[in-house]
Each structure stands twice: as C-alpha cells, then as structure tokens.
C-alpha cells in the first residue's frame, strides 16, 4: 500500500489538471500559432508559465485504484499487476480467464 500522502497528492494533481486543461490548451494554441505576432505569443508563454505546475497533465502519475502502487500498472484496468492478478484469479474481473495452451 502506498503512502496516503502520495495518493492524495496525485488526486489533487488530477483535479488541477482537469480544471486547467482548457486554459492550458488555449494558451498552447496561441504559442504554437506562427501567424500571430511574436508579442502575443510571448505574452501567452508568460501566462502559461504563471499557471501552477501541478496543473499540467504530465505531473499526474497513473496509480493503482486499490493499492496506490505507482509502478506496473495496466491502463485498461487502472490496477497494478499484483492487484490485477489477485482479482483475476478470484474471478472478480469479467471475461478474464487464466491462459493455458
């Protein structure tokens, strides 16, 4: 089980990233638009730099929903490999069966 402070920090970052996503996308579109004057693009760069860093999507870490483990996660299930194996062998994940050939 991961530290609750790490899990809570990541959840706070997820909320901030969702809240700031539209604003960041608009500013990035202005910065990358070559048809606009340099001054406008530079102002957009400064505004983008003023936004909190924790609001960036890249700061969010994919963690297991059950254990909070940060490594060895499957995106499709939002579970770490350990929790996925336990749930799958217990028959808790519909459609997932142990492979044999």
From Swiss-Prot:
SUPFAM superfamilies: Glucocorticoid receptor-like (DNA-binding domain). Pfam families: Ribosomal_S14. Gene3D superfamilies: 1.10.287.1480. InterPro entries: Ribosomal_uS14 (IPR001209), Ribosomal_uS14_bac/plastid (IPR023036), Ribosomal_uS14_CS (IPR018271). Keywords: Ribonucleoprotein, Ribosomal protein, RNA-binding, rRNA-binding. One of its GO terms (biological process) is translation. One of its GO terms (cellular component) is small ribosomal subunit. Residues 1-20 are annotated as: Disordered. GO terms for molecular function: rRNA binding; structural constituent of ribosome. Binds 16S rRNA, required for the assembly of 30S particles and may also be responsible for determining the conformation of the 16S rRNA at the A site. Part of the 30S ribosomal subunit. Contacts proteins S3 and S10. Belongs to the universal ribosomal protein uS14 family. This is Small ribosomal subunit protein uS14.
